[in-house]
């Protein structure tokens, strides 16, 4: 299983890596790639496309600095790009945004397989979310 995690907060990124490692500890050939920003994530995705490899799961923070050269304004745009170039990749957007309208807009425009609030889930619940998303369920 090949997983991409993108978050501009290194501490949160490392925590997510630990959670994902635990969630998929039985997975064969688990590979986790981390990116701290949209620019690095785009370069990583392009590299994987060039060598004909795909990510099985992308876990992406919504609020991140833009990568203007590729017109990636936030994690939502990054998620859309990832799904475009790797249509079989499952995606989860993490956000600290609490406004219902904005969450609805993310869900409708980006259409991630999972949408989670950073402040709203326990580790156990987050593990369940990403495991279910990989199995094809929506959250």
PLM features: residue spans?
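C-terminal output helix
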Residues: 119-130, 134
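Two-component/phosphorelay signaling modules centered on CheY-like receiver
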Residues: 10-35
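As written
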Residues: 106-114
């Amino acid at each position: 299983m090949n997983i991409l995690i993108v978050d501009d907060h290194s501490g949160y990124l490392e925590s997510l890596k630990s959670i994902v490692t635990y969630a998929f500890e039985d997975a064969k050939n688990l590979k986790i790639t981390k990116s701290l920003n949209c620019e690095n994530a785009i370069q990583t995705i392009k590299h994987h496309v060039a060598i004909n490899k795909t990510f099985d799961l992308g876990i992406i923070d919504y609020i991140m600095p833009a990568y203007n050269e590729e017109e990636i304004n936030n994690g939502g745009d990054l998620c859309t790009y990832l799904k475009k170039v790797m249509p079989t990749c499952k995606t989860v957007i993490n956000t600290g945004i609490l406004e219902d309208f904005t969450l609805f807009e993310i869900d409708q425009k980006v259409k991630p397989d999972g949408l989670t609030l950073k402040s709203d889930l326990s580790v156990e619940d987050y593990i369940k979310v990403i495991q279910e998303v990989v199995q094809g369920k929506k959250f």
